[in-house]
Every structure is written in structure tokens, then in C-alpha cells.
């Protein structure tokens, strides 16, 4: 396993998403329905208040909505040597500092913690520190992405062209 040459200067880089993500009440409800989470604090303000929250509470995996956008920006911004069309999540960890609530403005500070290439496959670890409008921590997310090395596709195209010319 090695760090790809084009990624060596990227390790430790920081990216701040240019805008915040506003958590909407209806988005929380829609997401809860989509993931079949029927907890009443996702749907009813009175139930959320009875549980001690000032607004609807987002399901635990709600961060995936905004996080996916930030991840795609990271691959473009850092020019990670990975074929983005052939990438999947290998692992994801969340550390919740507090629940995500309706009307939260979430800000993403994202770091490329590691990039490793082995046998035409790239493993990239991306960490996002998510904060609210006051700069207080909400969630820390660490995602490990696994994908085909970007240059691998070029080799594949050359191989296909060579075979086609026979």
C-alpha cells in the first residue's frame, strides 16, 4: 500500500464548504419516513418539546443528505486520484456532540486524513467537523471511501483499444 504520488500533498488538507446547510422541518420528516424511523420527535414539535428539545430532532443518519454534497465537493476540490463514478462507502463513523435539530445551520469543515492506493484501488479517509451557527460542535463524521484509482480507467481504455485493434 502506498500514498499515490498525486495525493501526497493533499493529506491533511482542509476544506470549508462555502455555505451552510439549513436543516428543514419537512426534510427531517421526509427523511424519517424514507428510513422508516417512526420516533415521534422526528414528526411532532410537541413530542420533541416533551422530550426536552426545542425543535424536531433529525434521525441519526440525516447528516448523509448534506454530507454527500460535501464529499463530492471534496473529491473535486482536492483532486483525489479516484474514479468518482466507481466509489462506495467502506465505512462511516459518527460522533454526536448533540442532536441535529430543525432550523440548525450546519457548517462543514472537512479534512482529507489519508489516501492509500493498492492494486488499482484507492482508499480515502475524509473527516468532517460539523458545527452550528455559533461554531459549537454538532457531529464529527469520518468516512472511508473505496474506489478504483483514476488512472486505472485510462489503462483500461488503452487495453480495450488495443484489443479492439486486433
Curated annotation (Swiss-Prot):
Keyword Cell division in annotation: no
Molecular-function annotations in GO: (3R)-hydroxyacyl-[acyl-carrier-protein] dehydratase activity
Entry's Gene Ontology cellular component terms: peptidoglycan-based cell wall; plasma membrane
Family annotation (CDD domains): R_hydratase_like
InterPro entries: FAS1-like_DH_region (IPR039569), HadA-like (IPR016709), HotDog_dom_sf (IPR029069), UPF0336/Enoyl-CoA_hydratase (IPR050965)
UniProt keyword list: Acetylation
Pfam families tied to this protein: FAS1_DH_region
UniProt key word Acetylation: yes
Domain annotation MaoC-like: ranges: 8-131
In-chain residues carrying the UniProt-annotated modification N-acetylthreonine: 2
GO biological process, one term: fatty acid biosynthetic process
Family: Belongs to the UPF0336 family.
Name the record gives this protein: UPF0336 protein Rv0504c
